[in-house]
C-alpha cells in the first residue's frame, strides 16, 4: 500500500481555521513490530480478526486476508492461557507461510498470567484498565472511601508491573485501551460515567508505567456514542499537554454498527479528531467482515489529506447544464482507473464550474459541448474527443505521461 509524504508535524496546537493542511499533534514514536505509531509517521490502519484464536489455520488465514488489503496491524482476542499459547503457533505459521505481521493481543479480565504469556508471542498487548484487575461490583455499595480506592490502585500496580517489565525487556509496546462501557466501579463512583472517568483510568495506568521507566504506550478512549468519544479524546490531549506527555492516540468508535450509518458514525468520530490533528492510528469497528473496515479507514485518511493510497475523484453533483450522463461516466472512469495511486481525476459535467473546480486535479474530463469531451492535463486543455471515446482517450493521456500502471 503506497503512501505519499505525510503532512507537516507540529508541536503547536491544532491548526487555525484558515489552515488548509492538517497540523498533527506531535507524539512519541511507539513500535508495533515493523510499524511505528506516532512520531510523525503516517496514521496507521488496523483491525481485528473474528476467528477464535484456538483455530490456528483460520486465524492465520484471517490475519493474512487483512494484511494483504492494507491492514497494517492486526489484533486478536486472547481470553485464556490456551489462546495465549496458540499465538506462538499463529506467529510461527505466519512467518513460515506468509510474512511477519504486526500483532496485538487483546487481554481483558484479570489477565496478568495471560498477558505475560502472550507478550512473548506478539508485538503489542492491549489491556483494558476497567477489567485488567476486575473487582466484582457490590450491589449495596454507595461510595468508595479514599482508602478503598488506593487499595485497589496498589493492587493494580502490583498486577501491572510484571507485564510492564516483560514488555520493557522485549522492547515491545502496550495499548492502554479504555472503553466507556467498562469503566471500573471505583472510577464510576469517583468520576461518574464521564469522559473524565475515562481519562483518569488511562492516566492511572500511564503513571504506573512511567514510574517503571516504560514509555512504549499508545492510548485509546473509545465509546459507542460519538460525542463521548470526542470529549474523552480531547480531554486526554489536554491532560497530556498539561502533564508533558506525548503518547500517540488510537481512535475508534465502538459498536458503530453496520452499513451506511456505521460508516458515517465512525467517520464522524474518527474524522473529526483527525481533522483537529489528534490521532495516530485508527480502527473502524463495523458489524461486518473485518475486511470491509479497511477501505473505510483509507477513505477517511484520503479525504483529510493524511494519506493518499487511491485516486482522488472530483465530480460535480450534476444539474441541468450537464452535457452527459455524469453518474454513468464517473462510474466508467472510476472502474478504469481505480487501481492507480496518487492521481487526482476530475469529471465535470459542464464548462461553468468545470475548469475552476478541477484546477488542482492532475487530469480533467469536462463536457464543453454536446457529444464531445474536453480532456485536461492540470489547467491545460489537451484535446477534444467524441464522448464515446472519452474514457479511452483519458487512459491514453495518462499512459502518455508515464503515470499508468496495468491493473
Swiss-Prot record:
InterPro entries: Dihydropteroate_synth-like_sf (IPR011005), IspG_bac (IPR016425), IspG_bac-typ (IPR004588), NO2/SO3_Rdtase_4Fe4S_sf (IPR045854). Gene3D superfamilies: Dihydropteroate synthase-like, Sulfite Reductase Hemoprotein, domain 1. Signal peptide: none annotated. This is 4-hydroxy-3-methylbut-2-en-1-yl diphosphate synthase (ferredoxin). It comes from Cyanothece sp. (strain PCC 7425 / ATCC 29141). Its cofactor is [4Fe-4S] cluster. GO terms for biological process: isopentenyl diphosphate biosynthetic process, methylerythritol 4-phosphate pathway; terpenoid biosynthetic process. The gene is ispG. One of its GO terms (molecular function) is 4-hydroxy-3-methylbut-2-en-1-yl diphosphate synthase activity (ferredoxin). Belongs to the IspG family. Pathway: Isoprenoid biosynthesis; isopentenyl diphosphate biosynthesis via DXP pathway; isopentenyl diphosphate from 1-deoxy-D-xylulose 5-phosphate: step 5/6. [4Fe-4S] cluster binds at residues 316, 319, 350, 357. Pfam families: GcpE (PF04551). It catalyses: (2E)-4-hydroxy-3-methylbut-2-enyl diphosphate + 2 oxidized [2Fe-2S]-[ferredoxin] + H2O = 2-C-methyl-D-erythritol 2,4-cyclic diphosphate + 2 reduced [2Fe-2S]-[ferredoxin] + H(+). Its EC number is 1.17.7.1. Binds 1 [4Fe-4S] cluster. NCBIfam families: ispG_gcpE (TIGR00612), PRK00366.1 (NF001540). Converts 2C-methyl-D-erythritol 2,4-cyclodiphosphate (ME-2,4cPP) into 1-hydroxy-2-methyl-2-(E)-butenyl 4-diphosphate. Keywords: 4Fe-4S, Iron, Iron-sulfur, Isoprene biosynthesis, Metal-binding, Oxidoreductase.
Amino acid at each position: 500500500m503506497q503512501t505519499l509524504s505525510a503532512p507537516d508535524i507540529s508541536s503547536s496546537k491544532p491548526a487555525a481555521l484558515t489552515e488548509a493542511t492538517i497540523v498533527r499533534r506531535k507524539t512519541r514514536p511507539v513500535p508495533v513490530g515493523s510499524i511505528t505509531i506516532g512520531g510523525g509517521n503516517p496514521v496507521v490502519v488496523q483491525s481485528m480478526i473474528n476467528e477464535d484464536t484456538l483455530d490456528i489455520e483460520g486465524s492465520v488465514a484471517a490475519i493474512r486476508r487483512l494484511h494483504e488489503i492494507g491492514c497494517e496491524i492486526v489484533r486478536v482476542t486472547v481470553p485464556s492461557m490456551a489462546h495465549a499459547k496458540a499465538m506462538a503457533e499463529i506467529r510461527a505459521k505466519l512467518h513460515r507461510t506468509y510474512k511477519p505481521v504486526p500483532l496485538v493481543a487483546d487481554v481483558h479480565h484479570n489477565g496478568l498470567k495471560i498477558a505475560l504469556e502472550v507478550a512473548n508471542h506478539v508485538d503489542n498487548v492491549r489491556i483494558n484498565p476497567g477489567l485488567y484487575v476486575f473487582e466484582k461490583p457490590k450491589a449495596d455499595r454507595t461510595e468508595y472511601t479514599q482508602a478503598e480506592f488506593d487499595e485497589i490502585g496498589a493492587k493494580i500496580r502490583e498486577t501491572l508491573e510484571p507485564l510492564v517489565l516483560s514488555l520493557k525487556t522485549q522492547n515491545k509496546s502496550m495499548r492502554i485501551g479504555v472503553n466507556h462501557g467498562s469503566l471500573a466501579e471505583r472510577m464510576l463512583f469517583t468520576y461518574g460515567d464521564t469522559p473524565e472517568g475515562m481519562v483518569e483510568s488511562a492516566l492511572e495506568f500511564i503513571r504506573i508505567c512511567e514510574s517503571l521507566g516504560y514509555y512504549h504506550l499508545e492510548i485509546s478512549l473509545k465509546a459507542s456514542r460519538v460525542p463521548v468519544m470526542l470529549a474523552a479524546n480531547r480531554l486526554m490531549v489536554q491532560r497530556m499537554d498539561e502533564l508533558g506527555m506525548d503518547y500517540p492516540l488510537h481512535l475508534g468508535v465502538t459498536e458503530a454498527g453496520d452499513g451506511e450509518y456505521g460508516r458515517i458514525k465512525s467517520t464522524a468520530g474518527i474524522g473529526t479528531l483527525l481533522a483537529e490533528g489528534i490521532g495516530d492510528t485508527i480502527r473502524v469497528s463495523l458489524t461486518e467482515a473485518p475486511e470491509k473496515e479497511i477501505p473505510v479507514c483509507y477513505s477517511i485518511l484520503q479525504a483529510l489529506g493524511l494519506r493518499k493510497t487511491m485516486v482522488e475523484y472530483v465530480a460535480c453533483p450534476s444539474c441541468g447544464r450537464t452535457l452527459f450522463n455524469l453518474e454513468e461516466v464517473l462510474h466508467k472512469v472510476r472502474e478504469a482507473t481505480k487501481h492507480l495511486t496518487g492521481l487526482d481525476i476530475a469529471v465535470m459535467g459542464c464548462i461553468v464550474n468545470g475548469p475552476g473546480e478541477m484546477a488542482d486535479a492532475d487530469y480533467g474530463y469536462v463536457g464543453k459541448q454536446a457529444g464531445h469531451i474536453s480532456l485536461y492535463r492540470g489547467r491545460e486543455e489537451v484535446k477534444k474527443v467524441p464522448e464515446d471515446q472519452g474514457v479511452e482517450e483519458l487512459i491514453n493521456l495518462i499512459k502518455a505521461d508515464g503515470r499508468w500502471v496495468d491493473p
